[in-house]
Amino acid sequence: MSKTISILGATGSIGHQTLDVAEQLGLRVAALTAHSNAERLEAQARKFRPRLAVLTDEAAAKDLAVRLADTDTRVLGGPEALLEAAVCPEADTVVTAVVGMVGLRPTLAAIREKKRIALANKETLVCAGQLVMDAADAYGAEIVPVDSEHSAIFQCLQGCADRREIKRLILTCSGGPFYGMTAEEVGKMTRADALRHPNWTMGPKITVDCATLMNKGLEVIEAMRLYRLPLDQVSVVIHRQSIVHSLVEYRDGAVLAQLGTPDMRLPIRYAMTYPERAESPAEPLDLLSCPPLTFAQPDREAFPCLRLAEEAAEEGGTACAILNGANEEAVGLFLAEKIGFSDIPRLVAEARAAVAVRQGPSLEDILAADQAARQAVLARA
């Protein structure tokens, strides 16, 4: 069980809920980071009294330093300061809750210090899964997923000593706010429409990814990397109720599922307490009052981002970094209301076609592919 944690991305949805869990479990907080929200990070720092607080926006970091001048918390600014938070010696667990590729280098740094990684930054495994998993093996670092789907699979795999026993992993997907719509109808949806997730409360970027089904596509890639399985052993089903969080089908015909209320504090808590379990204040699942559980095939025509992610996973190399970088840039433009909803998959597909894929990539190759994909999107938006 974790005792002291660092949280990368403390002011976002996952970071905020992680601090709730830390308070409930009595965990100490060694470091907190965010991008630019000095006001919220100040409040968190005053409450949890970390040794280190980081804002990657340097102007905001200067503001935070003034705000926390009367405390013992050291304040650093700039992207490189994330690395210092990731290797903070007091922390035994690093929660990577930042959004996007910015989480990759800090995650690798924490792995080299043999920290437990409570992984909520899926882009790290999507873009550089082989490098990350190889590093975790080499340094003996433990990676425990925080995403509800991968936490569910992680739990369903407890006791599985041989990956050859697995027939397939089944990731559940709510379908997002536009489930059942045609491609034409989906294309007319606005920013406000996309940010209305039916079951979960999350940050804006991941909420849009859920609306396009890119989030599920990224989770397919993450599952392949985390559990070292090929694409044909990872499938997706639509499950509107978000009660079955994912399933594992074994070769003997047994199917194990993890169920629970749609509350991110549950997988966060498990990542903190694993291999133990601790009492939770979250609302328990009442099987007698929950709605009927339904399952359906996803519509890859109306939601092409899922297909684009699967194609990138099949190609390998830097294809997934290109996919992810293009998607991050396109979603940012959509949230800024500079492009329409249907432009997201269009721009991702065009960036994939424009940027060459390299196999067996180094970290530098992955970072270069990410930047090239972003530039390709900006050139075509």
Segments and roles (model prediction):
Residues 1-381:
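Catalytic, metal-anchored helix/loop core of enzyme active sites in primary metabolism
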